[in-house]
From Swiss-Prot:
This is Auxin-responsive protein IAA33. GO terms for biological process: auxin-activated signaling pathway; response to auxin. The gene is IAA33. Residues 40-49 have a biased composition (Low complexity). Residues 1-11, 19-32 have a biased composition (Polar residues). The keyword Endoplasmic reticulum does not apply. Aux/IAA proteins are short-lived transcriptional factors that function as repressors of early auxin response genes at low auxin concentrations. Repression is thought to result from the interaction with auxin response factors (ARFs), proteins that bind to the auxin-responsive promoter element (AuxRE). Formation of heterodimers with ARF proteins may alter their ability to modulate early auxin response genes expression. It is found in: Nucleus. Pfam families: AUX_IAA. The N-terminal half of the protein contains the conserved domain II which is required for the correct degradation of the protein through the SCF-mediated ubiquitin-proteasome pathway. Interactions between Aux/IAA proteins and auxin response factors (ARFs) occur through their C-terminal dimerization domains III and IV. Residues 1-51 are annotated as: Disordered. Induction: By auxin.
């Protein structure tokens, strides 16, 4: 048996108003709480630090705008011809070179060499593309890194097709 008895809404409101009756100003309980942005140096003067310097103290959190924009879900990495996909967190990488290194470790056996590694040679014989939010397939590396992290929904690793025309030799 649970000894907890639920209290009615009226008794909760009464208790809330009794607890707040000792304060100087009554609180308005009808409007929602909206955290106010504070400057980085935590004083009340208006600073021109811009959007990057704002932090929100609303719920005991100091969250930078860049941090909020970098929290993205992991994207699916699909290697054409394989039935099992991988997932990778793009916000854990700082550049295309870092992504290329991670992709090489995922899909290339014995991938120890990272000298002069970029997306064009991360996985030999393959091209690295991505799907954006509109399901367009685009070549990875065309956008700045931050924009790529923001719009990439899926990374596709496509095999490079060889010359499909075969010249017949007269022998």
């Amino acid at each position: 048996m649970n000894s907890f008895e639920p209290q009615s809404q009226d008794s909760l409101q009464r208790r809330f108003h009794q607890d707040n009756s000792t304060t100087q100003q009554p609180r308005d309980t009808t409007t929602p709480f909206i955290p106010k942005p504070a400057s980085k140096n935590h004083n009340n003067s208006n600073s021109s630090s811009g959007a990057a310097g704002r932090s929100f103290q609303g719920f005991g959190l100091n969250v930078e705008d860049d941090l909020v924009s970098s929290v993205v879900p992991p994207v699916t990495v699909v290697l054409e011809g394989r039935s099992i996909c991988q997932r990778i967190s793009l916000d854990k990488h700082g550049s295309y070179q870092s992504l290329a290194s991670a992709l090489r470790q995922m899909f290339v056996d014995g991938a120890d060499s990272t000298d002069d590694l970029d997306l064009s040679n991360a996985i030999p014989g393959h091209l690295i593309a991505y799907e954006d939010m509109e399901n367009d397939l685009l070549l990875a590396g065309d956008l700045t890194w931050k924009d790529f992290v923001r719009v990439a929904k899926r990374i596709r690793i496509l095999p490079v097709k060889g010359n499909t025309r075969q010249v017949k030799r007269n022998e």
